């Protein structure tokens, strides 16, 4: 299935049905009076987050959505039926923005629903206008028009851990080694053109979602290369795994480039817990491994792990470390949401 993470759509709720002008006509009843029913309410347009989706591709082929019009009222005080609602189903993690890209709602939980456009009310039938002066009103209200708006849908995948690095740093190979995902893998930059998700199963109770995004290059925050469009997919992650290609000459420069792009993008990406790893060590001898590990650790001011996505060397250990950080972050978030505990006093 093709990946699409941003699309503009147009929604319109249904118009309300018109009220009816009708009079009671029955045998032996000379002056039956008005009995026009009200029009039905126009249909609403809703958006709902559902599990099992990870792309907005369905909205590439249809961008206009209109709810049903309310049915007009009828005689004998029969009200019209309401128009049919439209429910737009989107992946969990989809943001809804107005035409100016201001956030309307974040569909961050499965089952969450939000009203995008409310249907117009139905018009009153002539029964409502009967009075002591006018006992046979010959007019009714038309239904109110529905609402119309243009909105943007922007998907930010929900993953626990994000993989970052320059193009060809071996992120897709690492994802394939860590999970059952089957991303496209080739020995050239920008092989990955869309985010990939994989579920990492370390053991019972040790499971998390790993996201691989297209590689960053210098100036990505200004739109260079693929730009930072896909960085939004790691905004929700708890931990970053930063892979540096150990076979290249300037490993420190590679690390600095990615760090700069994370800081320039904002959204606190640069402040997330980060595991720095030198990848492709299967192509290095022991002496070169140690030399490059020390060089990168000194520049970054943090420990550097040695891994090989190709052979799987040290991959499990790195994933367990990432899971421990994810668990710690989730525990801290839960405690913060619960608020300070009040001590019991007699």
Curated annotation (Swiss-Prot):
It holds the Pfam family MMR_HSR1. GTP binds at residues 165-172, 190-194, 212-215, 279-282, 308-310. Its cofactor is Mg(2+). It is found in: Cytoplasm. Its main location: cytoplasm. PROSITE patterns: G_OBG, GTP1_OBG, OBG. Signal peptide: none annotated. NCBIfam families: Obg_CgtA, PRK12297.1, PRK12299.1. Belongs to the TRAFAC class OBG-HflX-like GTPase superfamily. OBG GTPase family. This is GTPase Obg.
């Amino acid at each position: 299935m093709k990946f699409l993470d941003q699309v503009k759509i147009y929604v319109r709720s249904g118009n309300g049905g018109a009220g009816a002008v009708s009079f009671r006509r029955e045998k032996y009843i000379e002056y039956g009076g008005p009995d026009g029913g009200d029009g039905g309410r126009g249909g609403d347009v809703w958006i709902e987050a559902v599990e099992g989706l990870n792309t907005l591709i369905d909205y590439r082929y249809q961008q206009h959505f209109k709810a049903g019009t309310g049915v007009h009222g009828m005689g004998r005080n029969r009200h019209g039926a309401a128009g049919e609602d439209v429910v737009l189903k989107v992946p969990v993690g989809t943001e809804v923005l107005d035409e100016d890209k201001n956030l309307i709602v974040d569909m961050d939980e499965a089952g969450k629903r939000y009203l995008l456009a409310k249907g117009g009310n139905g018009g009153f039938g002539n029964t409502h206008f009967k009075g002591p002066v006018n006992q046979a009103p010959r007019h009714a209200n038309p239904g109110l028009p529905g609402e119309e708006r243009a909105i943007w849908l922007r998907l930010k995948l929900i993953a626990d851990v994000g993989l970052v690095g320059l193009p060809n740093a071996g992120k897709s190979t690492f994802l394939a080694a860590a999970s059952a995902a089957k991303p496209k893998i080739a020995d050239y930059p920008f092989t990955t053109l869309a985010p990939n998700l994989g579920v990492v199963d370390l053991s019972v109770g040790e499971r998390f979602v790993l996201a691989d995004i297209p590689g960053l290059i210098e100036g990505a925050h200004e739109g260079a290369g693929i730009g930072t469009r896909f960085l939004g997919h790691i905004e929700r992650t708890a931990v970053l795994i930063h892979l540096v290609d150990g076979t290249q000459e300037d490993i420190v420069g590679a690390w600095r480039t990615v760090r700069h792009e994370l800081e320039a993008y904002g959204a606190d990406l640069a402040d997330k817990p980060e595991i720095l790893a030198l990848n492709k060590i299967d192509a290095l001898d022991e002496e070169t491994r140690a030399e490059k590990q020390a060089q990168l650790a000194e520049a970054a001011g943090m420990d550097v792990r040695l891994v090989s996505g190709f052979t799987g060397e040290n991959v499990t250990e790195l994933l367990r470390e990432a899971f421990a950080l994810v668990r710690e972050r989730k525990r801290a978030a839960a405690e913060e949401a619960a608020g300070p505990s009040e001590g019991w006093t007699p």
